[in-house]
Amino acid sequence: MTKFVFVTGGVVSSIGKGIVAASLGCLFKSRNYSVSILKLDPYINVDPGTMSPYQHGEVFVTDDGAETDLDLGHYERFTDTPMSRLNSVTTGSIYQAVLNKERRGAYMGGTVQVIPHITNEIKERIHRVARNTNPDIVITEIGGTVGDIESLPFLEAIRQFRKDVGRNNVLYMHVTLIPWIPAAREMKTKPTQHSVKELRSIGIQPDVLVCRCDRPLKEGMKEKLSEFCDVPVESVITAQDASSIYEVPLVVEKEGLAQQTLELLHLEPRKPDLSQWQTLIQRMQAPKRHIEVALVGKYVQLSDAYLSVVESLVHAGIATDSEVKLRWVSAEDIENYGADKYLNDVSGIIVPGGFGIRGVDGKVRAIEYARKEKIPFLGLCLGMQCAVIEWGRNVAGLNSANSAEFEPETTNPVINLLPEQQDVVDLGGTMRLGLYPCRITPDTLAASLYRQEVIYERHRHRYEFNNAYRNSLLETGYKVSGTSPDGRLVEIIEFSDHPFFIATQFHPEFKSRPNCAHPLFLGFVKAAIEQTKSD
C-alpha cells in the first residue's frame, strides 16, 4: 500500500517546506522507493497561470501543460521524476470542482459545506495521485503557515486522512524555525512550541520536526523540543542553512531524516546510494573557473520569477566545473541608459520569457548588443520573439517590425498570434502549454547541441514566428534550426555568423536537472567560458 507523508510549515512563511519535501523525495529515491510529490496551495486562484511573477514567482509548466507552483520544479529536479497537473492543487481548483458537482446535482440537494465536501475533495486529490502514479510514497506539501485561516480545510483533510488509511500509513512532518536571538546569544524554541501547539489544536500531532536554523542544534535543545512537542528526540531533525539547496538532501540524510521517516512508516530502511549527488556537490563546491552572464529581464527584482533559468545555469556550471555568476539587468534600465553600461564585460547574455510590452525595447537592445559584439546569447520564449523583432528592425530593415501582442496594428508583425488562439477569450490555461515535439534541422548549432533528430520541450505562449517572414530571415544569415514536425511552427532560430546565438520558442529550463544539464544551457555556458578566455 502507498504510504503518505504530509509536510506542514510553522513560525514563518518561506521556511523551506518545498526543499524539505523535495530532499526527502530525493532520499527515498536513493533507496529505490518510487515517489510522487503533491503541492496543496491555499490561494483561491485556480492555478498560478495568471498571477504576477512578483506575487507568485515563476510559473512552472509540466509535460501535460499544467501551470503550477515553482515548488514542482524543485520536486522534478531533486527526484528526476516528471510531475503533472495531478501534483498541483489549489483552494480555487477544489472549490471549482465542488461547485461544478453541486451544479450537476451530484450532492442530491444536500447542503454543501467545507466539511465534508471540501475536505473530501482534497482527500480525493491526494488519493488520485496515489492511484494514477502508484508510487511507494506520496509526499504532500501543504502551502502556507500553520495558523493561517486559508490552510484550515487542508489541515482538517490531512487530519482525517490518517484515520481513513490507517495510522501506520501516514506521517506528519512539521518544518519550523529555531531563531538565534543575538541579544540573548541563544537559540529559542518557544516559536516552535507554539507552532506545534497550534497544529495539535487542529488535531495533528507531528511525528517529525525539521528545525531550520543557522547553526547546529545542540542535543539539549533537541531534548527540550522533544519534551515540549511530544516528539521522540531522534525525530527532531536539524536542517542547518546550506550554501546551496542541493546540499540539503545530504544535510538531512546525515541527521537521519529518511531513516527515521521510513521506520515510522514501517518501511524497510534500505541503504541509500547518494554517490552521484555527492559528486555533483563536490563539483559545485570546487569550481575551476568563474564566469559572469547577464540575465536581462522584466522581473529582476524577484529572482524567483526566473527560478528554473537560474537553476539551469547552476546545472550547466556543475557540468563544466564552473561557477556561473548572474548579473541581474533590468530591461528598462537598458532602455534608459543603453546596453553597453550593463553588458560590456559579461561573458554571455540570456533573455528569458515574459508577457506584456514593458521592457521589450530593452530586451531588443540587449539582443542587438549580443549580436553585434559577438557575445554568446540564449533567448527563451519572449527572448526568441525579441530576437526576431531585433532581426526585423536592424537586419532586415523593417523599421516597424514588432509583435502583434505589443502593437496589433503594426505593418510588419514578425511575431503573430497562433491561429488556434484567435477566438480565445479566457486567459487562464488557454495558451499553447506543455510538451510538444520539435524536429531539429541538420547541420545547425541546435543539432550539434541536442544530437537528436526530434526533441520534446515544454511551451507556454500564444504568439509565434510569422512564417510570412521566414524566407527573409533565411536570406540574412539566420537559420530556422527547429520546427514543429509538420514544419509549420518555428521553434528555434540561430544566427550563423556568431560564436553562439540561439533562441527558442519553448522553455528548456523546465527540463534541466542538477545531474543532467540541459544541452542548450550547457552549450551556452561552454560558449561563455570560451568568451572569458578570449577576453
Swiss-Prot record:
Residues given in the record as L-glutamine binding sites: 54, 354, 382-385, 405, 462
Pathway(s) of this molecule: Pyrimidine metabolism; CTP biosynthesis via de novo pathway; CTP from UDP: step 2/2
Example GO biological process: pyrimidine nucleobase biosynthetic process
The reaction(s) this protein catalyses: UTP + L-glutamine + ATP + H2O = CTP + L-glutamate + ADP + phosphate + 2 H(+); L-glutamine + H2O = L-glutamate + NH4(+); UTP + NH4(+) + ATP = CTP + ADP + phosphate + 2 H(+)
Stretches for region Amidoligase domain: 1-267
Membrane-traversing stretches: none
One GO CC term, this protein: cytosol
Positions annotated to bind Mg(2+): 71, 141
Source organism, top-level taxon: Bacteria
Residues reported to bind CTP: 13, 148-150, 188-193, 224
Molecular-function annotations in GO: ATP binding; CTP synthase activity; glutaminase activity; identical protein binding; metal ion binding
Active site (catalytic residues): 381, 507, 509
One Pfam family this sequence matches: GATase
Protein residues bound to ATP: 14-19, 71
Regulation of its function: Allosterically activated by GTP, when glutamine is the substrate; GTP has no effect on the reaction when ammonia is the substrate. The allosteric effector GTP functions by stabilizing the protein conformation that binds the tetrahedral intermediate(s) formed during glutamine hydrolysis. Inhibited by the product CTP, via allosteric rather than competitive inhibition.
Keyword field: ATP-binding, Glutamine amidotransferase, Ligase, Magnesium, Metal-binding, Nucleotide-binding, Pyrimidine biosynthesis
Gene3D superfamilies, alphabetized: 3.40.50.880, P-loop containing nucleotide triphosphate hydrolases
Function: Catalyzes the ATP-dependent amination of UTP to CTP with either L-glutamine or ammonia as the source of nitrogen. Regulates intracellular CTP levels through interactions with the four ribonucleotide triphosphates.
Record's subunit section: Homotetramer.
Protein name: CTP synthase
Originating organism: Crocosphaera subtropica (strain ATCC 51142 / BH68) (Cyanothece sp. (strain ATCC 51142))
Gene name, Swiss-Prot/TrEMBL: pyrG
